[in-house]
């Protein structure tokens, strides 16, 4: 195995308790494999904890990672450092302090970021665990719906995040009319409350719909983390067959390069390394990430001037001139060799 990846905010990870997680940590340490964790909460308040008040849920989730890794040399990858909702931005300082403390106490802790202030999630991300576990009949009971309504409204106020910030990316065949619109916009068009429309969308997607939402971060936080020595770069994106795409698929990495060339990001060598060699090292990928004899020739050629002066967020990439996968040219300027693209990639052995 390459390691273990946990999504503690989602099923089935959200049901894992501390003792079970400690066993996973022990296993990773035994075989010197990384544990990549999407924490239980990445916002000031969330549906992962019962109490809406007191310590930030984001920081409680960090406390859990501290607890399960205490006294170990675990290779812990926090994926990813985001702060969902405007009221969560203030947790950034303590988040960094916790990461530093982990390292000071022997845990090989790192985190990663993407160069976007929004992100993609499943439509159920704002539904509490107890509601998701109910039968359809139980969900229809007025008392349960009232409890849910009060909880979501309170969370929205405390978080600085609401249905106006949740854009539908995909519900399913026949529901294309919803794509690209916020839950609030769809509710208004259908003469329903935001909550009723949201629950209907959950049902129509069989609770598997996809959403784009934010804010997850700020340009200032991203700029700061670009200089943090324990931060790697990633996209958190993949091309979907249907619906609205995650904007990060187009220009997330070019934007990191653009920041570097404009002097707001890390140095260019460090920026490239965070995307390549440092990531290969972190996940122990053999013969990847470096330009060395005997290594696989995975190259991206970019135009510095074009990258530096481009306008980002235009649903297209910029600055990338050539891409080689395993030594074969798959992108030459704007011409994509689809045949080569299908055959040049390979599963990585670890």
Language-model segment annotations:
Residues 7, 36-40, 79-81, 111-114, ...:
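Generic beta-strand/beta-sheet core signal
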Residues 10, 41-43, 82-84, 278-279:
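Acidic, glycine-rich active-site loops and adjacent beta-strand->loop/helix elements
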Residues 209-222, 267-272, 280-316:
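Acidic, glycine-enriched loop/beta-strand segments at the rims
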Residues 253, 258-281:
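Gly/His-enriched, cation/cofactor- and phosphate-binding structural elements
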């Amino acid at each position: 195995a390459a390691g273990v990846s946990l999504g503690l905010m989602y099923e089935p990870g959200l049901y894992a308790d501390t003792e079970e997680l400690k066993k996973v940590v022990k296993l990773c340490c035994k075989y010197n494999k990384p544990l990549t964790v999407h924490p239980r909460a990445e916002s000031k308040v969330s549906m992962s904890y019962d109490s809406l008040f007191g310590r930030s849920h984001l920081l409680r989730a960090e406390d859990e990672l501290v607890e399960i890794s205490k006294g170990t040399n675990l290779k812990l990858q926090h994926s990813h450092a985001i702060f969902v909702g405007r009221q969560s931005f203030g947790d950034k300082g303590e988040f960094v302090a916790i990461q530093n403390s982990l390292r000071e106490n022997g845990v090989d802790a790192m985190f990663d970021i993407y160069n976007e202030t929004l992100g993609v999630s499943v439509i159920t991300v704002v539904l509490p665990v107890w509601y998701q576990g109910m039968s359809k009949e139980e969900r229809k009971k007025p008392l349960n719906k009232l409890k849910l309504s009060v909880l979501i409204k309170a969370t929205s106020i405390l978080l600085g995040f609401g249905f106006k910030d949740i854009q539908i990316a995909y519900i399913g065949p026949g529901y294309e009319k919803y794509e690209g619109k916020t839950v609030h916009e769809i509710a208004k068009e259908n003469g329903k409350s935001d909550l009723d429309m949201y629950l209907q969308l959950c049902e129509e997607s069989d609770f598997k719909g996809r959403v784009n939402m934010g804010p997850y971060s700020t340009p200032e936080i991203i700029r700061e983390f670009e200089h943090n020595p324990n931060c790697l770069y990633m996209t958190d994106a993949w091309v979907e067959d249907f619906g609205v795409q995650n904007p990060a698929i187009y220009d997330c990495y070019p934007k990191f390069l653009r920041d570097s060339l404009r002097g707001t990001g890390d140095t260019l060598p460090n920026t490239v390394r965070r995307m390549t060699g440092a990531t290969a090292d972190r996940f122990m990928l053999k013969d990847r990430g470096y330009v060395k004899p005997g290594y696989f020739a995975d190259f991206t050629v970019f135009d510095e001037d074009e990258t530096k002066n481009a306008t980002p967020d235009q649903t297209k990439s910029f600055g990338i001139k050539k891409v080689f996968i395993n030594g074969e040219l798959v992108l030459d300027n704007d011409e994509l060799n689809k045949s080569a693209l299908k055959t040049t990639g390979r599963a990585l052995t670890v």
